[in-house]
Every structure is written in structure tokens, then in C-alpha cells.
Amino acid sequence: MSLQATPASDAWYRSVEKTSQTDDERIKDITVLPPPEHLIRFFPISNTPVEGLISQTRKNIHNIMAGDDDRLLVIIGPCSIHDPAAALDYARRLKVVREQYKDTLEIVMRVYFEKPRTTVGWKGLINDPYLDESYRIDEGLRIARQLLIDINRLGLP
């Protein structure tokens, strides 16, 4: 949802005290993002196998780092996710390897949605999910949350 800065729609915005007359002179548009609670409620994991997987994996990692588990922690994955279908394909393949080596390795898929060192061009799935410079961050957040849950539903943390 995009709100043009109009007297009616920016009342909340103008209620913030400005420090000078030049504050925010270049703002042309304000896009409201969903609060994290909306994504959590729309994609719940409470009392699901996904929640159990995440909780158990965190305990396993803690035990490995504390020296109470002899397995090796392996965090592996692509530099940046841009294609959810390809990410799920990768996750399915990695899940097989995770099962194969579960006695010696704790394999966790690295899932990163941004391009932190990119100064020009595409900034990542969350910032530009459709690769068209539309910057639908609200959609990027939704797609990212759904993808993370889909990966976890495969049994892969």
C-alpha cells in the first residue's frame, strides 16, 4: 500500500517534531510496511513441527558450541536467495545430505535475502522481490517468511 504524502494521510508523520524546516523535504512517497506481528500471525509456527525443529536445532548448536556435542556445525547455502523455487530445490538436496551425516554433522541451511556489499544493482529478495526495481518490500518480507517456513517444513533448519 502506498500513501501519498497528503495532509490527511501524513498526520501521523507530521506529529513527529521536526528539528528544522528542511527535514524530509525530499520524501515523495511513504509505503507502509507490515509490522513483524502481522507476518508472524499470517505465517504461524507456534505448536508446529517447524517450531520444534527450530528449537531443537538451536539446542544442538548450543551444545556443539559448548563442547557437549562432538558433531561439527556446518552452515551452508547460497550467497543470496533470489529464486524461492531454486532455494527449495537446494533445500531438498541438502536435506538428504543432512540425514546422511546426522551422526557427525549438524547441517543448517544458510538463507540470506540481501546483498550487503552491493552498492549498485539489485539489493536482494526483500528489497526488490520481482527483480524489476518496484521495491515491494512488503511482498519481499512475505515471500521471505514463507520460504523460510517451507524450508523448515522439509525438516531442514
Question: In which residue ranges do the predicted regions lie?
Answer:
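Short, basic, glycine/proline-bearing loop/turn elements
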Residues: 46-48, 79-80, 131-134
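N- or domain-start disorder-to-order transition segments that initiate the globular core
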Residues: 25-68
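Active-site-facing alpha/beta catalytic cores
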Residues: 2-23, 104-157
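Glycine-rich anion/phosphate-binding loops
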Residues: 81-101, 134-146
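Hydrophobic, well-ordered secondary-structure segments
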Residues: 4, 64-65, 86-89, 127-130
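Generic secondary-structure signature for well-ordered alpha-helical cores
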Residues: 59, 66, 95-103, 149-156
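Short glycine-rich or small-residue beta-strand-to-loop segments that form or flank ligand, phosphate
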Residues: 71-83, 108-112
